[in-house]
Amino acid sequence: MISQNTYAHPAFMPWKHWSAERLGIALAVLAAFGFSFKAIFVKLAYAAAPVDAVTLLSLRMVFALPAFLWIGFAASRAAPPLTRRDWGMLVALGLLGYYASSMLDFLGLQYISAGLERLILFTYPTLTVLIGVLFMGKSLEKRQVGALALSYAGIGLAFAHDLSIAGDLRAVLIGAGFVFGSALTYALYSAGAEPAIRRLGSARFAALAMLVSTTATQIHFFITQPLSALIPSGP
């Protein structure tokens, strides 16, 4: 019989013995890996049925809503009540990060490949660095300059690849513009989220910001789309 102490052994749960920095890096890599699949699934959804970006994003938000309601409730039970300043910060960042950024991203994927979209969208860390340097008094390190150069060189190569396949410069430019707007709004969100997370905690902030963006997305859907858009038209 296996005792409970056996499962606490490093061989069963090695992350229990990791440092905070190592665990943070592992979680960030896992998040980036999962985040990378989003564009692939969105492209598959566009190919499977005639659906617009607003409807698809609305469905995505609704499916995720129960999880964020639970996380927000659990994280807020023992926490102090939110002030007006907290709510203002949550509304602004929720609209910027998960509503505007996601909407621009879904619109861009109607025009460009998932590969180019990923490359452009993942420039948001470098954009966050630039925002910090230009507006928050932070310094730019040499390794960050190298990361910026590599990021934009990769975008140039992927852009040329998409253009050679699509043959439609206008479509590629429109799609790239939407996705770059998504990266920029998400970078602004990331820069503003740092003090919000310190004040509210990461789980509470993320859940409440997502609830704000979900509300905004549903309002956008009901204003611009008929309810029949939620009914699949394919076989």
Where are these regions (language model features)?
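Glycine-/small-residue-enriched transmembrane alpha-helix faces in small-molecule transporters
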Residues: I2-S58, L95, D168-P195, M210-I219
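Small-residue-rich packing faces within the transmembrane alpha-helices of Major Facilitator Superfamily
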Residues: S36, V62-P66, Y152, T214-T215
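Specific transmembrane alpha-helical segments of multi-pass solute transporters/efflux pumps
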Residues: G34, A39, L69-L121, L157
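Specific alpha-helical transmembrane segments that line the substrate/conduction pathway
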Residues: T55-P66, G97, S102-V145, S182
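Hydrophobic transmembrane alpha-helices of multi-pass small-molecule transport proteins
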Residues: F68, V91, I131, L140-D162, ...
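Cytoplasmic-side transmembrane-helix entry/capping segments in multi-pass membrane proteins
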Residues: I25-A28, T83-A92, L140-A153, L200-A209
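Loop-to-transmembrane alpha-helix entry segments
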Residues: R84-R85, R118-L121, G137-L157, L169-G175, ...
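Membrane-interface helix termini and inter-helical loops of multi-pass transporters
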Residues: I40-V51, L107-Q110, F159-V172, F221-P235
